[in-house]
Amino acid sequence: MTNTALPTSSADQENDTQLNELHKSQNAVVLLSGGLDSVTCLYWAKARYASVTAVSFDYGQRHNSELVAAKAIAETAGVNHRIIDIDIAQLGGSSLTDHSMIVPDGDTDKFPDKKRDEIDNDAIPNTYVPARNTIFLSYALAVAEVTDSNHIVIGVSSVDYSGYPDCRPEYIAAFQHMANLATKAGVTGHHLSIQTPLQQLSKAKTIELGLSLGVDYGQTISCYQADANGLACGVCDSCALRRQGFAQAGVADPTHYQS
């Protein structure tokens, strides 16, 4: 079934204008990994909110090139940047934190129908880090409280992604519900929202959005196993999705690959 957009009424336009003005007086926290999706979210938030704090994590990931990228991106964007140290690597269970595990090559055709709600456990790649988004969002929630922020922005998508369960809309809705039950801000009437501007966007559409906002994708690193110089492997799932996105957007890929 094709969805047809309804005409926008003057009342709807007025409500949108009022909402935009409200957002311009509010603050936001953005999860910034240093990758394509998160930097798009950072610039999206900058265009909407009064103040933005970027939060990155040194969690024992396979390489620190993405953190180097995140620092440079935050500096270019002119936003406050916090890097939080947490050692998820000690838990294991992911090729992104356990060097004894092999990062699988990417395959952008593995889910051609995009019905990600039907993905079973066998289809979730070993690059999934157990409970990572829950851990990251929990820290971001704490930062939101201490920075008087009403919004947390995260670059999850249900379209071009690797099949991780904590990227789905129902997960985000559940976390937002929990956030407003479990925080001082939530119970005192200062509603906290989890914003997912990329949720229904393909990688190509995400790139188009970012370029319209002034993003320099040459600063970003998406690779799961970039080398010490920040060169991407070109074959992991994240690299495959990135390559496909730039190709579909008809935009030159500024990524520096190992081969």
From Swiss-Prot:
Binding site for ATP: L32, S33, G34, G35, L36, D37, S38, V39, T40, C41, L42
Gene Ontology molecular function: ATP binding; ligase activity, forming carbon-nitrogen bonds; zinc ion binding
One Pfam family from the record: QueC
Keywords noted in UniProt: ATP-binding, Ligase, Metal-binding, Nucleotide-binding, Queuosine biosynthesis, Zinc
EC number assigned by the record: 6.3.4.20
Catalytic reaction list: 7-carboxy-7-deazaguanine + NH4(+) + ATP = 7-cyano-7-deazaguanine + ADP + phosphate + H2O + H(+)
InterPro entries assigned to the protein according to its UniProt record, in alphabetical order: QueC, Rossmann-like_a/b/a_fold
Cofactors required: Zn(2+)
Disulfide bonds: none
Cofactor note: Binds 1 zinc ion per subunit.
Pathways per UniProt: Purine metabolism; 7-cyano-7-deazaguanine biosynthesis
GO biological process, one term: queuosine biosynthetic process
Keyword Zinc attributed: yes
Top-level EC class as recorded in UniProt: ligase
Keyword Zinc-finger appears in the UniProt entry: no
Coiled-coil intervals: none
Residues involved in Zn(2+) binding: C223, C233, C236, C239
PANTHER family: 7-CYANO-7-DEAZAGUANINE SYNTHASE
Similarity remark: Belongs to the QueC family.
Known role: Catalyzes the ATP-dependent conversion of 7-carboxy-7-deazaguanine (CDG) to 7-cyano-7-deazaguanine (preQ(0)).
Name of the molecule in the record: 7-cyano-7-deazaguanine synthase
Species the sequence originates in: Psychrobacter cryohalolentis (strain ATCC BAA-1226 / DSM 17306 / VKM B-2378 / K5)
Upper classification of the organism: Bacteria, Pseudomonadati, Pseudomonadota, Gammaproteobacteria, Moraxellales
Name of encoding gene: queC
